[in-house]
């Protein structure tokens, strides 16, 4: 990499792109980028670092730039076309990240669900114990030139994680998602097998996932979970309204009892994966326990605030399995309150392909409210609607619009769980504005 060049990020507000931009900035590289003008939660960190954010415009491009192209954009994007026409070096996000890993003990976190939460937890724990660079999918990134560890989120979309050859990899689960790219579950499984073959030292995988049990590769695969056949087993689990406690057993030996101020079974599993990695890197597990206790979570993952006499939870969940996990966590922390799911379906292809799963998982809430479907940069229309999903759920499921929140405006002493990967926060802000 060249410190005389300026690294120009096309799509700098993207969750991974903003994280990578922050890492390069921390390591002393010159960084700027472009994106849509609409405010996104990721730009706060970029602005705090003094990184210039420009509106998309081919005129932004000039000699001396190294262009980092966001994976959300095709080669037909006007800025990418202009960069290539000018002869500028153009690197895709995942390619640059892959090039950076060799300097560290690198630990990737892959999985259809739970990547960001687990990456954030691992980064927090290791940062408290040794120098650690990290890239988290919530727009958070930190670069330390002489770091021991590099923790990063490895995205399976379009097989982008094939660019990575890490020392270790955590695999949280394998599920069918991204139906605009993957044909079926077997197609997703083949991608995870491919990246497993590129790991140098070891893989830590959730033991109850049938797809992950099929992984067959040259490095050891250590399974974690709650069953006796798992290499790292969580036992004597206690889930309360303040968090969870559990023992960790490895090869018949109790490694310790651990406490987390987090909710939901998935956070016990995420913590178990982190403990397993720390164990193999010979990190003091008493210190790991102390770091686990101070973890507050990542952005847009079960973020809570009080609004009037209600609790508002903001979460990125946009797949049936994630919705189930988020509602499970809400039930654990607030067992005596009404749970209201406010969900923004994300992409038409995913909504159509996983319709039955969405209906089943959302039905775990006491009440369901839907917004219109959020399209994407790749897909802005489809033959399915939120009303189709509402009809599938039944149980008086309602639809809301940003200027008509009547379905939720009169709720009292309830927990409103806003979920989605699009712009669901605009509905949250409109709701909060009712009480100002």
Curated annotation (Swiss-Prot):
Q: Which compartments is it annotated to reside in?
A: Cytoplasm
As one GO molecular function, the record gives: ATP binding
EC number(s) from the headed UniProt entry: 6.3.2.8
What does the record give as the reaction this protein catalyses? UDP-N-acetyl-alpha-D-muramate + L-alanine + ATP = UDP-N-acetyl-alpha-D-muramoyl-L-alanine + ADP + phosphate + H(+)
Q: What is its main location?
A: cytoplasm
Q: Which UniProt keywords apply?
A: ATP-binding, Cell cycle, Cell division, Cell shape, Cell wall biogenesis/degradation, Cytoplasm, Ligase, Nucleotide-binding, Peptidoglycan synthesis
Annotated pathway: Cell wall biogenesis; peptidoglycan biosynthesis
Q: Where does ATP bind?
A: 111-117
Q: Which HAMAP family match?
A: MurC
Protein name, as recorded: UDP-N-acetylmuramate--L-alanine ligase
Q: From which organism does this entry originate?
A: Pediococcus pentosaceus (strain ATCC 25745 / CCUG 21536 / LMG 10740 / 183-1w)
What is this protein's gene name?
A: murC
